[in-house]
Amino acid sequence: MPRPKKCRRVGFIPGNACFHPEIKSQVQVVLSIEEVEAIRLADYLAIGQDGAAESMNISRGTFQRIINSARKKMADALIHGKTIRIDGGNYQVESGRSCCRRQSGECRTVNCDRCTGCMDCHKSTNI
């Protein structure tokens, strides 16, 4: 049996879960929450790989694999006019924030005052 994936720490849940070209495409590229977080840390905030990996509570090698995957998916979507959908992943939101609105993935809540730990308690409130 394979070892379970380590829960990645994220500090941002995007408000928009779908981005599409001007002419809507039926083909989608799915980015996980941790891939979006890696893009945010490395490209938007210009944090080095060591710092970004530490922020996400993962190794530098794992961070490198996540960021490479995210960049490849984004390039594919931009070049081929595909819709980008943000969904799922194996992550934990930083203390004081809620991630219980996600409908898929292995999200874990931290300090969510609306949630009792049930993964289905806020499914109707999708991002």
UniProtKB/Swiss-Prot annotation:
InterPro entries named in the record: UPF0251
Family annotation (HAMAP family): UPF0251
Similarity comment: Belongs to the UPF0251 family.
Protein name (record): UPF0251 protein Ccel_0627
Organism: Ruminiclostridium cellulolyticum (strain ATCC 35319 / DSM 5812 / JCM 6584 / H10) (Clostridium cellulolyticum)
